[in-house]
Structure formats: structure tokens, C-alpha cells
Amino acid sequence: GSSKKLSFEDIILSGVADDKGLYLPTSTTLENLSYLTQEDLTYEDFVKTIFIALDKNSAKYVEDLSIYPGFESSPTPTLKEVDEKRYVMELFHGPTKSFKDYALQPLGAIADRRLSELGERGLVIVATSGDTGSAAIQAVKNSKNIDIVVLHPHNKVSEYQRRQMTEVIQDNVLNIAIEGSYDDCQNIVKTLLQNNSFNRKVVSLNSINWLRVMGQTAYYVWLTKQFTSPINIAIPSGNFGNAYSAWFGRENGLPINEIFCASNVNDVLTRFI
């Protein structure tokens, strides 16, 4: 695109690019990920290694940082055998029981550290159809340098998801129900990110933030390490962010064959593909 290249420090707090596209790594920004499958690392070190592979300057943000503060136990995913050669990777052991905790917890911690370094207070604006909002809130609710505003479509999230978001009582957390769809919420977020009149750092934790995709790639790195041959992956998909993370890992050397996107009656992605 026509947008300028940004450093790792800039990407932490960035969302939509000036040309309305998304920031992506250049061909020289990220080393091949295949070597990670040969390393004996804890899961948390997997994530840190991926961020450092993205940019060596990230080391000062992650090496001594607890990037899964909301997890009551180890963030290592659980792999359960269903039958011969079929397994389920469980990603619901985080604070909100959503796979999104695995990417948002590190991103929230890293963003808080970056803002502390700058001596600034950031504003996170998130659009959600349910899971992202609660996971984002849990990622930053104890942050010293971040306030968060979550937009969700009124009466279009489950009662469980609504309560996960609206029952967090913190001075730095604000929930807003929007009359409209999730896309309406997302359009508001994109407009605010492009036309920042808040006189402060505005941050997105949606999948438009590249570091969130990297955090999701981490559990595919871990998954491929559990097998001695390439695997196929079927991913429950509301949108393409999670599947894209698997694709990105495959493109950078992870032993993944086919990637299947599975959807329910909410089949917008299926119809799009």
C-alpha cells in the first residue's frame, strides 16, 4: 500500500493504516517459523520468541514481561485425542473461556508497557460480536495506562457474553450497546482510528492489529510441535482472523497441509469464500 513502514514500537499501538489497509510484515521482517518446532520452549516462551522473530526490538517489551497475567494456571493449550489421528486443541482455559484470550492477554500487556515507556495514557476501542469484547476487557482491566471502550450490537450478543462485558466494574472500562450490527460497530472503530481527535494514543485490539495475529499464530506453532508429520487443521470460524493466523504460520514454514474453515448458520465467511 501507500502507507509508510512502521517499527515494532509503532505497530503495538497501531490499527488501520493511512491507506485504510492493514499493517503486515515485509518479506524481510519475519524469519521462517519452522525452526520453532524444534525448540523445547514453554508456551509463554513460544509467544515471546514469535514476537522477537517479528522484530528484534520487541525483546525489551516481552523478555521479562508476564504476558498471560489473566490465566490462573499455565496457558499451555490442551490437546485431547478424539479418535485415531483426530485431536481437539482446547483454547478455552483463559479468563473468558475464549480462544481470544491467547492473543489479547499478551497484546494488552505489551501495549501497557509501551504506553508506560512513552509516559502516555492509551484508549483502546474495540468492536465486538461477543468474545473479543470480554477478552479485551480482561486483557487491560488492570492496566495502569489504558482505558477501554467496547462497542457491541444491542441485543445481538448472548446473555453470557453481555454479562462478561458489562459486569466488569472498573474505572477504565466502558461498554456501549450500538443499535445496529457488528459491522456498524466495526465501522465506527475504523473511523475513530483513522480520525483521531482524542489527543491521545488510540489503540485497536481487534484483528486489525497485526500483533494479535502473531499471538494467534503461537498456538499453531505449539500444535505442530506435538506431531512428527504435517497436519490438517479444521478451525471454527466466525471470521478469517484465526484461520489467517494458521495460514500465515504455514506460509512461514510450519508443517500444515490443509486448513478448513468450519462455520455454523452464521455463514458469512463460508459464503464469501
Roles of regions detected by a PLM:
Residues 1-273:
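PLP-dependent amino-acid enzyme catalytic core
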